[in-house]
Amino acid sequence: MTDLESELAESGWAVVDLPNPAPVLRARDHLLASLRRAMPDLADLDSYHAMVDDSRHVETLFELANEFWSARLGPAIIGENLDFFRRLVGPDLYVQRQPYLRCVRPGRPEDAAPLHRDTYYGASPYEVSVLAPFTAMPAEGAIRAIRGSHLEPDAAYPFRQLPAAEGAIGSPRHRLGYPYAPRLLDPALQARAEPVPVGVGQAMIFGLSLVHGGGVNDGTRTRFSADIRIVNALAPVRLGRGVDPQYFVPLCLSPVSRSAQRYLAANEAASDGACR
């Protein structure tokens, strides 16, 4: 077992240097250029909070996310490090079609996701999240996680269900990755959560049964990152989720899977022809 495999198995996450950080840097530059069209004086992504007020934040971020999705900047991070992720997850990979673009301003609890477990929201423990920052995430502004929680039963983490706000389903905030009916864990768990610093060109990789959360950004600079989910195409997962029937899309298939799909398609075509 490699060090990476051991860390994932025991802790529930690992921070790695991406073999090819170029798509992360390219995405960062693309996002900054997009924001500068409306904010020409924006020095860098870290300074975003000084340029956008609360009344415009969600709208601005949603517009930026749509550009991020249209340019397929998130899947490119996986695709241009494909050998690494195929060794980790398998040769048959699906990738999230619209990865989450995260923006957490300093001192804004409404921007950050509290501690949560994604399997409580319909995700599968077979899924892997790749958190790739576009700005440095030092300890004071980092995501937090509970070591070993990915192996514990749901009974160890009871939650309190909040009602869905009217009009929240399918809203820009919902599509940005904020739950419309949050399932809140015990706030006392924060004492067990540790910060996970991640630099630009690195990625935090974790399974979705891990208890984690952004928490309040206690730093002085805005935290921008991509949260890209990938899954083995042969794992028992739903490819659609919530308001998105194409939540996962194919990224790559092994030669065996390609041959199998052609065989199955040929049989289906022959069966359809016989029925006419």
Across the structure, where does each feature detected by a protein language model lie?
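Active-site rim elements
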Residues: 70-72, 188-192, 215
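N-terminal auxiliary "cap/dimerization" subdomain that precedes the catalytic jelly-roll/cupin core
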Residues: 1-94, 195-199, 266-276
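A general structural signal for short secondary-structure junctions and capping/turn motifs
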Residues: 5-7, 119-124, 134-136, 195-197, ...
